[in-house]
Amino acid sequence: MSDIIAYKLNGEIVDTQSIAGRESSAEPIYFDNSKEALHVIRHSCAHLMAQAIKSLYPKAKFFVGPNVEDGFYYDFRVDDEGTKLGESDLAAIEDKMKELAEKKFDIVKTCSTKANMSEKFKNDDLKQEVLKRIPDGEVSSYAQGDFEDLCRGPHLPNTKFLKFFKLTRVAGAYLGGDESREMLTRIYGTAYADKESLKEHIRIIEEAKKRDHRKLGVEMKLFTFDEEVGGGLPIWLPNGGRLRSKLEQLLYKAHRDRGYEPVRGPELLKADVWRRSGHYANYKENMYFTTIDETEYGIKPMNCVGHIKVYQSDIRSYRDLPLKFFEYGVVHRHEKSGVLHGLFRVREFAQDDSHIFCMPSQIKENILEILKFAGTIMENFGFHYEMEISTKPAKAIGGDEIWDTATKALKEALDENGFKYGIDEGGGAFYGPKIDIKITDALKRKWQCGTIQVDFNLPERFDLGYIDANNERQRPVMLHRALLGSFERFIGILLEHTAGELPFFIAPTQVVIVPISDAHLDYAKEISRELRKINVDSEIASKNESLNKRIRTAEKQRVPMIVVLGDNEVANKSVALRDRQARTQSDMSLAEFVNLTKEKLSEVHF
């Protein structure tokens, strides 16, 4: 049997240093790759990394080193001279970590008052920063060998368990996430209980680098960023514009088929309306504001208020409900520069946003309809997905009774139809609980995309109503819903999921036509016109370059189909087709090729 490295007591992980005779009422956590075990292993590995850095750079001072998904990081200052570490320094730190782990240091926990800890670390300004953020009361630290750091734990009992780890990258991070403070060095890493799991994780990291959507975006000429424009503000190039347009058109038809009405709200609204909605009090730090004619305005971070105003534009009857409004709404949210990341974290993005206004009795049926809609989309793109209910956060509007009712409605809709789901306590929006739809990509990474939120609060705040069958005024329920989440993020995920080999139906350029010489150019143009008639985007690669180079360029841009034209093809009205996704080469008539592309377009059913 594996060694016991910690315990689970009342739902919390408690290390062996803290269990203090309560073992009989706790569940043991063994040294393996379970979620709980990895939490402990990785937390201790972060401390081992810090110990190694301190050994190599004696002036180093450390801020915080928490676990993150699939690993850990530590923020620190190398010295007071501003020395920075890079990727080339990671190997030496790893070697020192292995050397220290083999010394088999016991990991010892000490508890004391905040004042005593402050005195103990009085010459360490970063420790003082940590202590400022800790509530008064007992404070703990953990020591191994000559290294000690403030920490809540939990930790391994000994460094001997730490054998299989990898430092993955170096980044910068502002102290406490505050852009006005100094930039610290941040090193990320991961750890496992066995060599095979670590090896697989490293393989996935290397594969993810090849699939990085930022790299693919350049190669496929989809989007760019420009510092003169500003960070987190993507610029869509013609190829990216075509990709987005195809996705938008498919979703537009799918929404209309399901009874949704297209609407559009303004991007700039008076601050008073954001006060009424609760955004001003609960979401202001994520918004951008400006003053016009001495009146404060806020740029919308969400589309819900605009859709509420559409609802309020007319008297509503129970016969009108449910009312389904949708919009490809452009929103702006403030993201700190340090977390901006390609299309995944941006400051401007477009949501496939919808708001459904319904009677309370219609909540379940509408949630189920949304879930089926979302499932259809994810399956068409080859994603597996799961669901999670997120409950009331610490910062929220509305009483517990309203939140309990809304959360219960979500659970019942899932339970009654056999959907499995997890619970994310405190992860809801400030105005209501939600179902998050999380997809799994080809590298087994999970991404939160779609969301469904039940909201009793905003209808109350804006005094929304409808006339029921008894001619009495009632309050509708508002369902907030996005299926992709945002076009930007979803496209980034899809690029990495497919390694840029996008499905034919949304590929920016679906066919590249390569005439061997100018004598074949007229036929290439004829084929392009035929494809245009059936909404297939093609390009003619007629540059003064070698045939092989033109084909390689099309392959680099991940174009699904490449057609090569020579004398035989012109004479026979045929094409020599290279189907990159089917990995086949074949000859066929032009009519057969046009029919093939029609079939490819019809493969998607939203």
UniProtKB/Swiss-Prot annotation:
Predominant localisation class: cytoplasm
Coiled coil: none
Region (Catalytic): 212-503
Short name of any one Pfam family annotated for the protein: HGTP_anticodon
Example of a GO cellular component annotation carried by this entry: cytosol
Catalysed reactions, as listed in the record: tRNA(Thr) + L-threonine + ATP = L-threonyl-tRNA(Thr) + AMP + diphosphate + H(+)
UniProt-listed Gene3D superfamilies: 3.30.54.20, Anticodon-binding domain, Bira Bifunctional Protein, Domain 2, Threonyl-trna Synthetase, Chain A, domain 2
Gene Ontology biological process terms, A to Z: threonyl-tRNA aminoacylation
CDD domains: ThrRS_anticodon (cd00860), ThrRS_core (cd00771)
Signal peptide: none
Function of the molecule: Catalyzes the attachment of threonine to tRNA(Thr) in a two-step reaction: L-threonine is first activated by ATP to form Thr-AMP and then transferred to the acceptor end of tRNA(Thr). Also edits incorrectly charged L-seryl-tRNA(Thr).
Entry-linked PANTHER family: THREONINE--TRNA LIGASE, CHLOROPLASTIC_MITOCHONDRIAL 2, THREONINE-TRNA LIGASE
Family stated for the protein in its record: Belongs to the class-II aminoacyl-tRNA synthetase family.
Protein name, entry field: Threonine--tRNA ligase
Species: Campylobacter concisus (strain 13826)
